[in-house]
Amino acid sequence: MKVKIELSGGLELLFDKKKVHEIEFSDKNEIPLKDLILYMRDNLLKERSELFVVDDTVRPGILVLINDADWELFGGISYNVEDKDTIIFISTLHGG
């Protein structure tokens, strides 16, 4: 199973300044979005995890899109990510 992760709005700075990550899970057909977020925290995130994850979900102020649609349309954190899905994380938190 391959999943494409896109980061913007400054989140890419926490992930080694990479906007796009391709992840492959060879032993799975689907993975809960919550598990994907925790995988990202544990394996891809390079600094300041509190700016991405709070209480095992994305921090408030981060917009999550699944294949270009709001994740709430798919059940939010309980969505099962499938092969070839694109998950986009956009930070709406900015300094002023």
Swiss-Prot record:
Q: Which CDD domains match?
A: Ubl_Urm1 (cd01764)
- Give an example GO biological process: tRNA wobble uridine modification
User: Which GO molecular function annotations are given, in alphabetical order?
Assistant: protein tag activity
Query: Chief localization class?
Result: cytoplasm
The entry assigns this protein to a family as follows: Belongs to the URM1 family.
PANTHER family, per the entry: RURM1 PROTEIN
Instruction: Give a short account of what the protein does.
Output: Acts as a sulfur carrier required for 2-thiolation of mcm(5)S(2)U at tRNA wobble positions of cytosolic tRNA(Lys), tRNA(Glu) and tRNA(Gln). Serves as sulfur donor in tRNA 2-thiolation reaction by being thiocarboxylated (-COSH) at its C-terminus by the MOCS3 homolog. The sulfur is then transferred to tRNA to form 2-thiolation of mcm(5)S(2)U. Also acts as a ubiquitin-like protein (UBL) that is covalently conjugated via an isopeptide bond to lysine residues of target proteins.
Q: This protein is called what? A: Ubiquitin-related modifier 1 homolog
Q: What is the lineage of its organism?
A: Eukaryota, Amoebozoa, Evosea, Eumycetozoa, Dictyostelia
